[in-house]
Amino acid sequence: MKLNLVQIFFMLLMLLLGLGMGLGLGLHMATAVLEESDQPLNEFWSSDSQDKAEATEEGDGTQTTETLVLSNKEVVQPGWPEDPILGEDEVGGNKMLRASALFQSNKDYLRLDQTDRECNDMMAHKMKEPSQSCIAQYAFIHEDLNTVKAVCNSPVIACELKGGKCHKSSRPFDLTLCELSQPDQVTPNCNYLTSVIKKHIIITCNDMKRQLPTGQ
């Protein structure tokens, strides 16, 4: 039996109407699932999108919670200073990178030249005598001297440095952290890893005539 044009047109029209109703019903059901379910919306995301969101949130948290504590509680005496100690500690719920560093002068850690941040170059002037143990870790603060001194005008906070009274910077400071690439190296063959970071600093401000605060 042959179909005329009218019958063919009618069948196509019915087919299109059926598809339209099916799509509408499907969208309605999908909406109902989202409205009635307690399932978090992020479970409907693609795994890639969810991973990116979590990574961003974790990254933001890291930038705001980590703090570097540098202690210069002792004035450097002639000769090679003892190696600083660097480790991680959990204080007040925040991960804090703790360091102890000795400074021979303001210029030792207040370096304003942002173009040269390579630790091997910055640490070279500390290798005064051959066959001496390399300094294990050292931190350089790339801020104006007055900016660092101004931290001492901030409210006193409790800390575990000598005296138990410290001051925290109101903003992250630009720092270069130098860490020996391998233990038991001796001068002049000291090789350092360079980490350019921004962290709040916590400092002690005792005897400002002889020492400058360092920080968290």
UniProtKB/Swiss-Prot annotation:
* Listed transmembrane segments: none
- What cystine linkages occur within this chain? none
Naming one, the record's GO cellular component terms include: extracellular region
Q: Can you say where in the cell this protein is located?
A: Secreted
Q: Which domain of life is it from?
A: Eukaryota
Query: Region Disordered: what ranges?
Result: 43-65
What are the UniProt keywords, alphabetically? Cell adhesion, Fertilization, Glycoprotein, Secreted, Signal
Q: Does the keyword Glycoprotein apply?
A: yes
What's the main place this protein lives? secreted
Q: Which Pfam families match?
A: RnaseA (PF00074)
Please give the SUPFAM superfamilies that the UniProt record associates with this protein.
Answer: RNase A-like
Q: Which family does it belong to?
A: Belongs to the pancreatic ribonuclease family.
Q: What does this protein do?
A: Secreted proximal epididymal protein required for post-testicular sperm maturation and male fertility. May be involved in sperm adhesion to the egg zona pellucida. Does not have ribonuclease activity.
Q: Can you name this protein?
A: Inactive ribonuclease-like protein 10
- Whose protein is this, by species? Homo sapiens
